[in-house]
Amino acid sequence: MRYFTKVLLLLALIVPLKAEQPLGLKLPTANDKIFSANPEQFYMYTTRNFEGVSSKPWTAGQYGYVRNLKRTDEGVIATRFHEGIDIRPVKRDKAGRPLDLVNAIADGKVVHTSKVSGHSNYGKYIVVEHDWGSGPFYSLYAHLNDITCKVGQKVHSGMPIGKMGYTGAGINRERAHLHLELNVMTHTEYPKWHAQYFKSKNYHDKFNGLNMNGLNIAELYIRHQRNPNLSLISFIQKVPVYFKVTVPRRGALDIAKRYPWIRIGNHHGISAAWEISFSSSGFPLAVTPSNRAVIRPTVTYVKPTKSSHSYHTKGILTGTGSQASLTSVGERVIALISGSFME
């Protein structure tokens, strides 16, 4: 019986749960300039005033640290992270309102619609769940004028699900755009975490943006165009690690149960802790058993930098050089991914 159990455990470690499927990605609108020599025709700009100079950089519509410039020991760096991409409209009516239809980027199922613009900075938005064989991924379509799909509805790649708009915080008609993300979900019990840390009402159940971690969807589109057989796992594996946090082990992590690619090493063995690897945006890249004994979440690696780590980690870390510790924001983030809020 013991031998049989060991065999089952070994099989669980080496046999994938499901074969990865082709992504079949399509752009969500008629704007395809992301693949051209003129990306400024694809991305929507933001207004900027830095050191007395006003500008409208289209680059601020890209994914990554592209906003809120600061002059530091490393020079001028952008310190505000943008989780997705902002796509310009290609059609407007006489009043300047966008006419672009918004389409599903891949086959999936609608799992959330937010039809009241005041309930989120996203304005009116849609979340579609996709299963490519590597755990559930969630595309998010924000600042919509209209939503034409329903929760539970199956959608196909390229199928219209809404109409571009300018709902949500800080957006006017001139800057109307589609904000697009592709995310993993941090924890399925997010509402409990939200209730513990925030007084504001959570209108979005587990599909709240704070529970979503977005990957670089622009880079994914470009690499997918070059290689239609690209897998999400191979894409994620190339994302560099910026920091690692080791947490006391109190059972399997919720995120590791849903995303087999995140599990590194023997998760069925005994260890004192989990070491979680993150990108600079806080995107979880790996969960590895660790024999390091910790009584609280501890930063065990950080990429050295001359400026504050807070500028490079969405405020999750503080410190400089090769030294870092969690901020209060970081402690909340780690509580969510580790599930310590459930204790």
Predicted stretch roles:
Residues 105, 149-150, 155:
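Surface-exposed strand-loop junctions at beta-sheet edges and helix termini
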Residues 2-10:
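Sec-dependent signal peptide recognition
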Residues 120, 124-129, 143, 153-228:
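Conserved, short, structured surface segments that act as functional micro-motifs
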Residues 20-124, 166, 203-343:
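Surface-exposed, glycine-biased beta-strand/turn segments
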Residues 83-94, 142, 182, 187-189:
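Small beta-barrel nucleic-acid-binding modules, principally OB-folds
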Residues 97-99, 103-146, 173-179:
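Zn2+-dependent peptidoglycan hydrolase active-site motif and core
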Residues 130-141, 157-160, 164-166, 231-243:
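A short, hydrophobic/aromatic-rich structural module that often spans a beta strand
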Residues 9-18, 39:
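Hydrophobic h-region of N-terminal signal peptides that target proteins for export
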